[in-house]
Amino acid sequence: MKKNTKKIVTAAGIAAGTAAVASLSAYVTIKALIDTALDREMPKVMEKADKRISGEKSSDEFTNRMESASESLAVQPNETVEIIAHDGEKLVGHYFPCEKPERVIIAFHGWRSSWHRDFGMISDFWYKNNCIVLYVEQRGQNNSSGEYMGFGLTERFDCLDWLNWEIERCGSDIPVYLAGVSMGATTVLMAAGLQLPPNVHGIMADCGFTSANAIWEHIAKDNLHIRFGIRSAIADRMCRRKIQVGSKEHSTVEALKHTHVPVILVHGADDHFVPVEMTYENYTACTAPKDLLIVPGADHGMSYFMEPEKYENAVKAFWAKYDRPRCEA
């Protein structure tokens, strides 16, 4: 009996030790993922994992065009503006006026990106179509302050701060559109669930994800081949500690169920970073007037590059419908 008891105790000890190691491994893995997602500085251990995280398969032609357009926009004359956000963070924007403005676009870039990188290619189209553009530097990135990014959870409120600035600068008569790419698209779609001023005539969202939790699960499972499941609770707690809001607390789907602001959704059908199914979810949930453009063969953020004419025609048709004053429901 004593030998059997000793074996049982030993086996139990090994099992407990194995479970503890597995639990620690899960914690360390998910911490690296959440630190990468939210921290201003990319953790050194993840610096070489960019391609695995995004799953992108962009061509050299796209990369070269994007870099050239980014460099060109970055050096164009503009007015650098600063505001203090609702929570005290300093936010930076770049204001591009035009001679005969027909509308204002407030543009929000994506995760670990920049205003001139994400909007370099489309900037000429906006300018030639009489748009004043305010390119925002998202919190926790580049010249805006903030220790963390928020995957739209915190940035959605920054939309209101920038809208207040825009109304002071341009008045409330000119139509305003919120635009975003990737996390910037999620930012403006989550903002759709807030009480937006009536001069916001539309939202233009390119390849946005539905929620922080949903995109983290996709990246973990499909791109990094890490089981997420139970780890989502750990991720949620870590997120809440960093930015005071949980990763499951808000989503674009819920926001779009309660908005009256017209929306145009764009997505590449071959997106490996943010699956196109997320845009279909957003489109189905949206109760406001809505347009949809899916670009075959386009990976993440490549829709304008792949089909510029279709993209421009869809956007111009959207403006033609909604430049007029918006009626509140």
What are these regions (language model features)?
Residues 111-125, 138:
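The serine-hydrolase catalytic nucleophile loop
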Residues 125-145:
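Conserved alpha/beta-hydrolase
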